[in-house]
């Protein structure tokens, strides 16, 4: 690698995930927290977590407040259950502290290393399809239909979809021509193309530079910690964050060829610790669970390979504090082509899956299929592990099931039962 490649990769990653700086404050702001304080908390907690990733694991994986987890925070915990946002932040804090302990004692590392090699490859492919679907959805290329057609292709009279498709083919052309930073250039060019289409909008009160607002420091609520409601919220945050992070780390490191022959991640303990520290920092500052981002794959595709990428990413998140409006004008139609294209790049491990052996191929297929269609990395891993144990039992290959995988299978079955009855 080189400093130039790392920087190009970082900028690509940050642009691909810059939406979180607008989406997360907008979402959590609806709970009464306010856009400005949450924006500041989102950027600072992401910077802290990225620095931890750089110095603890030397990996090019970016972290920030997780999509999905922030929706659960806002619409389920606060909106649906009627809890305060301080209550939700307390659950995030305790989850993060527990993750630090689990990381210190190697529990999370043992879980990752226990996942069979075939399943690790399937996770990478499934994540590729998942982020491809995110890109297609964000751009409005695929849209929900009636029950007869669950998902459909948009008409080309939708400007954002048209701009995104143009941007996708521009990105493909740049990549095929071996142009350095093809994904990043694709984002920039698509943003510019979006101006005459009205997709890229520059507000009248646009300011290049602005001072950040103070976040909500240590805004916790301890009075309802020992309740069933708190346990349900805490457990949901815990499970989703744990396996989303595991899946993302496996997917990104495999794409970057940073794994060993067994598919294990180097310095995984440090990577998991960075994720946990980021979550604690985020809760203390006033934002939802911090987790590893699948959009890091876009940066890897553009050249990021080491912790230097994470250091620069952290720096850019701090810089973003003072350029809120500049990041906000990059439309989802411009980042969508990057996510769709990275989905292609993450398909490669599928060729290494042994589909001739149904005890390997079926669990891999279920993992790959579940992630995009259930819109969940964690549920893809859970169903895949259950299917792996099931197939090995009926295939009379019990010796192929590691002890920890047995335990995970039981935990995942219990989790789905818990989800059904809660």
Model-derived regions: residue spans:
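Loop-to-helix transition at the N-terminal end of transmembrane alpha-helices
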Residues: 32-51
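Hydrophobic/aromatic residues within the transmembrane alpha-helices of Major Facilitator Superfamily
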Residues: 11-18, 48-51, 136, 242, ...
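Helix-loop-helix junctions within the multi-pass membrane cores of secondary transporters/permeases
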Residues: 1-24, 45, 66-75, 79-127, ...
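Membrane-embedded alpha-helical modules
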Residues: 81-196, 200, 311-422
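Helix-loop-helix hairpins and the membrane-proximal interhelical loops
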Residues: 1-37, 152-154, 184-269, 412-414
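Juxtamembrane transmembrane-helix boundary signature
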Residues: 47-67, 97-98
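Alpha-helical membrane-protein architecture signal
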Residues: 4, 166, 231-235, 270-277, ...
């Amino acid at each position: 690698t080189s400093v130039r490649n790392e920087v190009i990769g970082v900028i690509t990653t940050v642009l691909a995930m810059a939406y979180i700086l607008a989406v997360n404050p907008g979402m959590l702001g609806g709970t009464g927290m306010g856009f400005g304080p949450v924006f500041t908390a989102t950027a600072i907690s992401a910077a802290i977590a990225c620095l931890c990733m750089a110095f603890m694991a030397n990996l090019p994986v970016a972290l920030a407040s997780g999509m999905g987890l922030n929706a659960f925070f806002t619409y389920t915990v606060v909106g649906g259950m009627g809890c305060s946002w301080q209550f939700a932040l307390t659950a995030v804090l305790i989850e993060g502290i527990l993750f630090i302990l689990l990381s210190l004692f190697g529990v999370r590392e043992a879980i990752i290393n226990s996942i069979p090699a075939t399943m690790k490859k399937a996770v990478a492919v499934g994540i590729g399809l998942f982020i491809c679907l995110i890109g297609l959805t964000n751009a409005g290329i695929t849209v929900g239909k009636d029950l007869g057609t669950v998902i459909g292709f948009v008409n080309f009279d939708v400007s954002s979809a048209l701009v995104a498709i143009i941007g996708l083919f521009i990105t493909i052309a740049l990549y095929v021509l071996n142009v350095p930073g093809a994904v990043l250039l694709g984002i920039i060019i698509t943003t510019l193309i979006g101006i005459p289409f009205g997709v890229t909008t520059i507000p009248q009160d646009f300011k290049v530079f602005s001072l950040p607002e103070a976040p909500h420091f240590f805004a916790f609520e301890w009075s309802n910690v020992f309740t069933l409601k708190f346990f349900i919220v805490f457990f949901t945050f815990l499970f989703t964050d744990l396996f989303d992070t595991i899946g993302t780390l496996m997917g990104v490191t495999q794409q970057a060829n940073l794994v060993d022959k067994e598919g294990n991640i180097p310095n995984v303990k440090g990577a998991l610790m960075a994720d946990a520290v980021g979550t604690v920092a985020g809760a203390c500052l006033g934002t939802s669970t911090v987790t590893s981002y699948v959009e890091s794959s876009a940066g890897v595709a553009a050249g990021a390979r080491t912790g230097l990428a994470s250091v620069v990413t952290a720096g850019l998140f701090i810089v973003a504090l003072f350029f809120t409006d500049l990041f906000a004008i990059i439309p989802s139609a411009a980042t969508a082509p990057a996510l769709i294209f990275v989905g292609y790049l993450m398909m490669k491990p599928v060729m290494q899956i042994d589909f001739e052996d149904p005890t390997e191929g079926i669990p891999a297929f279920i993992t790959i299929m579940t992630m995009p269609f259930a819109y969940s990395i964690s549920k893809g891993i859970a169903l895949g592990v259950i299917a792996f144990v099931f197939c090995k039992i009926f295939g009379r290959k019990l010796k192929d099931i590691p002890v920890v995988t047995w335990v995970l299978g039981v935990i995942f079955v219990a989790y789905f039962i818990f989800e059904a009855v809660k």
